[in-house]
Amino acid sequence: MPLPKFMIIATLALCLALTGCTQRPSDGSTCAECHRGLEQVSASHLECVSCHGGNPLAAAEKAAHRRMFGPKNPADPKYWEKTCGKCHPYQLERVRANLMYTNTGMIKNSQATWEGEDGVLYATRAEAVHDAGGEPLKLQKVTQLDNLAGELYRKTCSLCHVGVDSNRVWSGSHSSGCAACHFPYNDNATYQGSDRTVKGKWKHSASHKMAVLPDNSVCVRCHNRSGRIALSYEGWNDGNNSKVPTSKGHLGERVISGARNATRIQPDIHHEKGMECIDCHTSRDLMGDGYVYENMYLQTEISCEDCHGSATERPQVEEIDRENEEVLRESAHYPRRMQQGDSMVLTAKGRKYSNVLQEQGKVWVQSKRNGKLHESKVITDTPEHTIVGHERMECYACHSRSVAQCYGCHTEYDQRELGEDFIKGYKTPGRFTETEDYRMLYPFPLALNQRGKVSTVTPGCQTFVTVIDSRGRKVRDEYVTLFKGRQQLRFAPFFGHNTGPKAIGCAECHANPAFLGFGQHVVEDSSIEATLICEKSEDKPLDGYLTMQYGRV
């Protein structure tokens, strides 16, 4: 008796489903016949077509690759809803609202410091998301921002955000979408695995094996410019004359993107102890929590006080009391998985860390990669942290070893030349070039930050803009852009990621005018005279935001 047609269809569907859930390409797949030696993504990922698409039964290359996603990167935002998002919808929704993808904060601050905000929140792509209060929000695509601030972002800053495949910068390239962090490039963006069909080819991740826990090399591919936090953390500096060989005409100890020579400085104490970026930063810091924030400090959920306590309060803890808590899922990839009943330290937003716990009254940080436990010193009620008048000090105001400071950014925009628009994907009239006056690490000025606390600050940004129109006329010449309605040099609150165990001494901080915002000065009698004077602001030092006349600030 012949089987009913619906039973045949159901049986075929079941077979396809089962073969799609195998951990390696099935015997019927032709993928492995060409891609011999290709690394398995992970033990839990499905067969090739589940991520890449294509036809696994075709023998000819063109036929097999037809309708592939990418084809090299199925994690690109063009395809991620059909690929990564099918199995990881929760993570995808978080990343779609994440600052490293939307760049809303970077775009907004570019507007604020160049031509002013217009009340619209722009992003790398138009997205329907939710704001920090949970209200629906429509982000507008930054290609609609048709002014100098929009041009600046699209032609310079945007190359680092995870929505763009940045593959043209030696040692600074990365893939796009989820692959930007989880399938990292090497310095040349070439594949170095065992599959001979793509061995040494550009542009590919270094391996086909997924980096579940991205290492510091992933972070440094983007965070090596601007605030240079990835460099500072590991103890590198690309300061003044970084393109000049440093010893007997030879290159420096480390060459980084842009043919810059990086030299050694004292690294962050956490790096010295063997901690990586991911040991402090949570997945919500890096991938977002599903809500759109207008600035980085609003998305970041960690603080020094989380692990070390404040002057008056110890670190806050909470037990894992549910079997489906996110902590348990995330820590499954660590050498020591957290268990129900563990007392987990809370972030500044009141969420549990997945690797920081309290045991027998002590706070321990587990390195996510190797499982090493680091005891976190709690400073609560110690004499040196309860000094009267220091209540408003951020921890890093005293404990920063250095802060990257770039003074005098001279930006030229020439409409006679073409510049690559990385968001539009093609060249348009208008090319940016930049030079700087002076770079330094120490001393660094202090000022109030967004939390109302005394914080380290850095120029952000001191931009002198020259605009040349299509006829070669200088429309603007070394123009100091407006900020809050007037021309002024600006400083921005900034944590330099170069922390030391020993604080700056009392005399050093209180007797050095640079820490107070007067810049580096020569003190003579009752007057303070700047040694770095800005030609566009004769009464204001380039490296300070305060001036003094007749004993008054």
Cite the ranges covered by each PLM segment.
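Bacterial N-terminal signal peptides that target proteins for export
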Residues: M1-A10
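Bacterial N-terminal signal peptides
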Residues: I9-A17
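Accessory cap/linker subdomain of secreted extracellular hydrolases
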Residues: L373-I379
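Short sequence/structural segments immediately N-terminal
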Residues: C21-L373, I387-V553
